[in-house]
């Protein structure tokens, strides 16, 4: 969560996160659909461990990613309201555009675009709330999710964070206070 505007938020992802977070956001949205609209069942991992799974009653079941870390703060935040989901979908859409701009190809997660555009049927209606900071405690700023994520980038991610030359990017007035 690097900017309140979903397009600018996508733009502000460093190169490594443009690649990595597209997958994680698709997993979050897939998990929201499965947890909210699916039927719980138990499966077994290859090692025999019992796994919680959710089966969707329609073709999404064979298309969407499996549910992951359903109690992770980001997953809980996403399922709290339709506006949280819509914000993440918009940011993810723009992040996919960012990926194409920076790397000259389409990310494989784009195959999920039309299946994730709709909110889960059973998601509560509500206002957007800033994402819950999912980071070490020392980076969290009470009541300031945006500031927390900027601090996290500065203190914990600065060693690898770099941005491709973005001088021609379509967004005006980029803000990267953590550089």
Residue ranges and their predicted role:
Residues 86-121:
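Charge-dense polyanion-binding interfaces
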Residues 1-100:
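An N-terminal structural lobe/cap that precedes and organizes the functional/catalytic core
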Residues 108-158:
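An amphipathic alpha-helical core segment
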